């Protein structure tokens, strides 16, 4: 399997390979795996994610945690999709609920977009963006038996700054994923779904899914309003 990660592509930063995604969701969809077989973890490679967004300015870069919709949960990788596909890229400024914190050249916002729970880092400086992300990371609970907090992350670079969307998670999959009969919906949301484009792998689900179903699914996998408020408070206490 490791040969897949070394096949012909564009090398990036000496230890990634930029490949065309063989199962695209976007009109232009890339996969960026680590060349070495290492675990899917964001903490040591968030700076790499910023660098990738800085180089691929026509793309939004995304990270799915190992139990947050990752297509290869046991191998470190990012994905990238062309900008203009996910509604959140254009919509987020209209959904700002407030400022969590200012830090150096960066601001951390939170959005009024329930049932999603969304934090947005806006930064012209790489080090400051990393510091804010680390603060968010350490403000999130880690589930028993897991190595990192559950989250999905989107990063794009525009107007000489990074925009980072962090979606903290409470749950891997909604109840409908394992439900029996008509209640069954094979929805396991990842970054793209949280960015506003819901993917249904099975046609029957595409036909029957409703706005209420989507709200229910997001409400289950994202934080509760009370937990989201606690996270924002923890962040402010650390800065």
Model-assigned labels for residue ranges:
Residues 1-5:
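Short, small-residue-biased leader/transition segments that mark boundaries at the very start
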Residues 6-26:
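Hydrophobic, conserved cores of late-appearing folded domains
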Residues 14-16, 28-29, 162, 194-196:
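A generic secondary-structure signal marking the coil-to-beta-strand transition
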Residues 17-20, 32, 80, 165-166:
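Short hydrophobic-aromatic micro-motifs
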Residues 20-36, 110-117:
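Residues forming anionic-ligand binding surfaces in small-molecule and nucleic-acid pockets
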Residues 39-47, 52-61, 66-72, 81-239:
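Conserved His + Asp/Glu catalytic blocks
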């Amino acid at each position: 399997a490791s040969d897949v990660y070394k096949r012909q592509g564009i090398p990036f930063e000496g230890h990634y390979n930029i490949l065309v995604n063989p199962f695209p969701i976007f009109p232009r969809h890339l996969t960026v795996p680590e060349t070495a077989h290492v675990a899917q973890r964001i903490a040591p490679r968030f700076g790499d994610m910023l660098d990738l967004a800085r180089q691929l300015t026509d793309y939004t870069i995304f990270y799915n945690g190992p139990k947050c919709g990752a297509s290869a949960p046991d191998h470190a990788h990012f994905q990238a999709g062309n900008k203009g596909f996910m509604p959140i890229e254009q919509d987020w400024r209209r959904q700002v609920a407030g400022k969590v914190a200012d830090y150096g050249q960066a601001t951390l916002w939170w959005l009024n977009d329930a049932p999603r729970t969304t934090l947005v880092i806006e930064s012209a400086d790489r080090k400051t963006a990393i510091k804010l992300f680390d603060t968010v990371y350490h403000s999130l609970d880690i589930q028993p038996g897991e190595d990192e907090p559950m989250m999905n992350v989107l990063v794009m670079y525009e107007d000489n700054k990074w925009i980072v969307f962090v979606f903290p998670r409470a749950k891997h999959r909604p109840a409908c994923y394992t439900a029996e009969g008509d209640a069954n919906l094979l929805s396991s949301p990842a970054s793209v779904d949280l960015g506003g484009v819901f993917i249904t792998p099975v046609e029957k689900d595409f036909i029957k899914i409703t706005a209420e179903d989507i709200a229910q699914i997001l409400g289950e996998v994202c934080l509760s309003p009370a937990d989201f408020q606690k996270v924002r408070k923890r962040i402010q206490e650390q800065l």
